[in-house]
Regions:
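Class I SAM-dependent methyltransferase SAM/SAH-binding core
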Residues: 114-166
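Short catalytic micro-motifs in class I SAM-dependent methyltransferases
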Residues: 181-182
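Short alpha-helix
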Residues: 237-253
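A short glycine-rich, Lys/Arg-flanked "PGG" loop and its adjoining helix->strand segment in the class I
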Residues: 192-204
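Conserved class I S-adenosyl-L-methionine
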Residues: 7-109, 122-126, 148, 209-233
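A conserved beta-strand element that flanks and buttresses the S-adenosyl-L-methionine
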Residues: 178
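Conserved Class I S-adenosyl-L-methionine
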Residues: 16, 34-39, 258-357
């Protein structure tokens, strides 16, 4: 994928010999050739110097906490499921865009945003699916997992190999920064630096929005208990308290700060109640790589999905006061028939949304 760009473009001479730096060098050359709008926003003092490229690339390779998205872990399954069922988290996606647009005074195709835990371009795809073409902003994915970045680039989406706490973007180059759902993968010690970095790269009146899950909540426990127990890679990452988000935003210099709950369910539709529920459960098992939840010998399909339903129940069951903030929020995994006679299965989740303005 990178060979064409490498043959045509030169950033620095001589080319780096460090293997990590060489990978970064080829990545940057590819961006310059195939994604010039993204490349133009990068910090030229970094990307034009071999020493700087080498230092950044080596620090990036040392980052831990994102390896479970590599090709040989659950990365391929995660990407595949997201692409196959783009509407599964549509309700939460729309809420995120609504809150962001409210602070920006609306969206424009001239705006440029960065998803700092962007994976393979999920936020950019969601924007193209959910926002009007004439106003959808240009959204770049940044991620420390090179497999994720390469997958985004292969799908013609702008993506940069970098970490959230040390991006490659120039000062005051972006209109908004988003950290959507995967922020807990950033190590606890690096989290304050992410907000400081967001402040640096945002334009005046730019907006930062981070979505993750409150420590101890059923949704956070889905990751720290469910994924940790039933995936090969485990999932031991601390989530957040409301006060932490407030402190991070305040210390970085943001104003008009708000931290609030956001309903972020998985939803699936089918022609039958059983089909909707089973499709939802199958999606969750596959997307999150729950390979230790296999169907047992002699277990019928009905019994298998019933067992999975019971295992998942603690991680999608809420008290009434925990979901009172949204009239559409459900308290437990539910299946019901809608007006068009189709059945909808819903796996409730509650996230924390933290927003600040520069």
């Amino acid at each position: 994928m990178l060979s064409a760009a490498t043959n045509r473009l030169t950033l620095v001479e001589p080319r780096p010999v460090d293997p990590n730096a060489s990978t970064m060098f080829e990545h940057l050359e590819y961006l310059k050739y195939r994604h010039p709008r993204t490349f133009a926003l990068l910090d030229k003092s970094v990307i034009s110097a071999i020493d700087a490229i080498t230092e950044r690339a080596n620090r990036l390779k040392e980052i831990r906490g994102h390896g479970d998205f590599d090709e040989d872990e659950r990365g391929a399954a995660y990407r595949g499921r997201q692409l196959a069922v783009p509407r599964a988290r549509e309700y939460g996606d729309l809420r995120i865009f609504t809150e962001l647009a409210k602070r920006l005074g609306g969206f424009s195709f001239k705006q440029v945003g960065l998803d700092i835990i962007g994976g393979n371009g999920t936020t950019a795809r969601n924007a193209s699916n959910l926002l009007p073409l004439e106003s959808a902003p240009y959204i770049i994915a940044g991620d420390p997992c090179l497999d994720m970045v390469d997958d985004a680039l292969a799908r013609h989406l702008p993506a940069v190999w970098q970490c959230a706490q040390e991006t490659l973007f120039a000062d005051e180059s972006l209109d908004f920064v988003v950290g959507s759902r995967g922020f807990h993968h950033v190590s606890a010690g690096a989290r304050p630096a992410v907000f400081t970095e967001a402040w640096r790269i945002l334009k005046r009146r730019g907006v930062v929005l981070v979505v993750d899950f409150e420590e101890g909540s059923p949704t956070a426990n889905w990751y720290s208990e469910g994924l940790d127990r039933y995936t090969n890679a485990g999932h031991r990452f601390p989530h957040f308290q409301r006060a932490e988000f407030l402190n991070f935003l305040t210390a970085a210099g943001f104003k008009d700060i708000d931290v609030f709950e956001l309903y972020d369910p998985f939803r699936f539709w089918a022609d039958t109640a059983e089909g909707a529920r089973n499709s939802l459960l199958e999606h969750l098992v596959g997307m999150f790589g729950l390979v230790k939840l296999q169907r047992e010998s002699g277990e019928t399909e009905r019994d298998y999905w019933g067992r999975i339903d019971r295992i998942f129940t603690p991680w999608c069951t809420f008290a009434a006061d925990e979901v009172a903030f949204d009239p559409e929020a459900l308290r437990r995994l539910s299946v019901f028939q809608e007006a068009d006679q189709r059945w909808r299965a819903e796996f409730p989740r509650v996230a924390l949304c933290a927003i600040g303005i520069k």
